[in-house]
């Protein structure tokens, strides 16, 4: 029986390793094909050989192409985590630290310091989180496997050109699984089009040069249509029985037209008497906060095509400039948590014996599974969501 068990185990190892062997062979063949195209993409054979010789595929990134989120984040959770007291304080410190650079950036590109720093804060938490996946590994894998190979081949060759031109050292090029990197998370192709050398050292470096990263971000927004004489928008109040059929950031009317329909700023004051086009944004429906948004909001949307993302950047920028929190509450009886509160939830889960790793404020799969169990034990809906209700229940249970 022992011999049979060993044989079965060996067969299992062979079966498990066969796909990996096949992947390695496919990858090697794919790299040879890519090498034959390199010169036409502006990449020398020497550069290609030097930086691909030791590459092995990371098949995990292929799975991300079609991965469906197991947990859809409500906007009140998204905003609570991205625009919290911690990020506002850190952002204001960065405004002070980089004031001279930001003033020059605004003069040259017409994008205010608060907006640039808000992008920085959301994209990498002010340089604390670039992403840990080596770009050449991820992009070469995605160039050879899965959907969108043509797109990722372009990003792969562009990454090699970035290295070849001496902008960023290859070992410093780590980022997201899809290839975004640096302080403000540019894709390689975006880097080539829009990154600038703002510190004057002859390199465009979004990893080790904060001035280059901030100026490149402003250049992106300017090219996306940002106007320095215009707000991104602001929170508004709608009159009762307001017809929201025409809501949407693309369905723009002038401020005068919105005013004629009874729309006011959230403090009750009248809208600007201007012909400025603006769309009505209702990110949580008619029961939640409402905003009039201008072309500058569209420029933020161009940075990352999600309205919740653009709103987080816009609101964080307002808070960095001394603005107040949103006035209208989100339509929920279980509001979202700041990162500090998320870490507290994780600490309380650890105290109850759940092995979820160090508290980091990131609500991942292990934290959600632990939350489901605890929610069931505490009489809450076991959905794995980290909100104020489960935080209160955990605090109460801890104090008993």
Range-by-range predicted roles:
Residues 1-2:
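N-terminal secretory signal peptides that target proteins for export/translocation
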Residues 5-17:
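Bacterial N-terminal signal peptides
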Residues 18-22:
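Sec/Tat signal peptide C-region and signal peptidase I cleavage site
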Residues 23-57:
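N-terminal mature-domain "stem" immediately C-terminal to a signal peptide or N-terminal signal-anchor/transmembrane
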Residues 43-275, 288-291, 300-317, 321-339, ...:
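Catalytic glycan-binding domains that act on GlcNAc-containing polysaccharides
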Residues 295-296:
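Low-complexity, glycine/alanine/valine/leucine- and proline-rich hydrophobic stretches
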Residues 337-342, 350-394:
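Short acidic, glycine/serine/threonine-rich helix-capping segments at coil-helix boundaries
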Residues 394-400:
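Intrinsically disordered, low-complexity Ser/Thr-rich linker and spacer segments
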